[in-house]
Amino acid sequence: MKFLTLENGQLGALVDETVIDIPEAARVFSVDVPATTLAGLVDAGDIAAQAIWELAGKAASQGVAARAYSDVAPLAPIPEPRRNILCLGKNYLEHAQEVAKKMDVSGKAPAKPIIFTKATTAVIAPGQPVPSYPQHTRKLDYEAELALVIGTGGRDIDPDDAWSHVFGYTAINDISARDLQKDHFQWFRAKSLDGFAPMGPVLVHRSAMPAPADIEVKCYVNGEQRQCERFDQLIFDVPAMISVLSAGMTLLPGDIIATGTPAGVGMGFSPPRYLQAGDEMVVDVTGVGPLRNPVT
């Protein structure tokens, strides 16, 4: 099951290469639907998702409320998150090591998850330009990541139950201003300028999620592959991160968790290869499809 947010903010479903406008399909078939937006569907839960998916399949088979995926310019799956994006830092060992070389810190695997947040106003759609902000930074960098979306909230979640709290996953690009990151010590500002969280294009329900070993997280800059790692190479896996994040702190439906980036970021090269206006980034997470954004 793959869902997306259409240009008008309404709920869509991707059936093969066909996008179904769910509110329009519901109107044509004279049925009630549990949600008309993707954020609303996440709140409604798994049973609602299955009902929407069955409606999408019926509409696709009859060509109702249907468009070719190539003709759709989706928004971010959750265009206006209700809370800051929760992020894991240095969650792949090779990335921790490349950062250590540049920032004079330990390259050992963190003993505990490194957690920070990104502002909700950083979220932008696939295809939307990422500003280069030359007046604010000279060290603009990319970070390809798999992002989880929480479906069932909870506090003090047992690791064995963690996956049942996940609605699905998507791709996110954790754009970072490395000079601001160093200047301010805390990473929030360096990762929260407007446009610093491209996300999408689709949200894949966890029932359609491959095994972590079969998911690759990749990033290309101007067609050159810079990052590639399997999702099972995380230092802190999904059960561990959800358990820690929910320890004494309630997770809510719609919360977004950026799970960490692999090695290959621009700052890791010698000399560093930071982004410039005119560059194009493509984040490709298995099952989600390319998240493409230019830099302006």
Residue ranges with predicted function:
Residues E7-N8, A13-T18, I150-T152, V221-G223, ...:
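Short acidic-glycine loop/turn motifs at beta-strand connectors
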Residues G12, G45, G127, G154, ...:
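Glycine-centered flexibility motif
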Residues R82-P239:
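Glycine-enriched loop-and-adjacent helix/strand subsegments that border the catalytic/binding cleft
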Residues A51-W53, R67-Y69, A73, P77, ...:
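Catalytic-pocket segment enriched in acidic/His residues
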Residues M1-A109, P113, V282:
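N-terminal non-catalytic cap/leader segment that marks the start of a structured domain
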Residues L6-G9, V42, A60, L86, ...:
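Generic detector of intrinsically disordered, low-complexity, polar/charged segments
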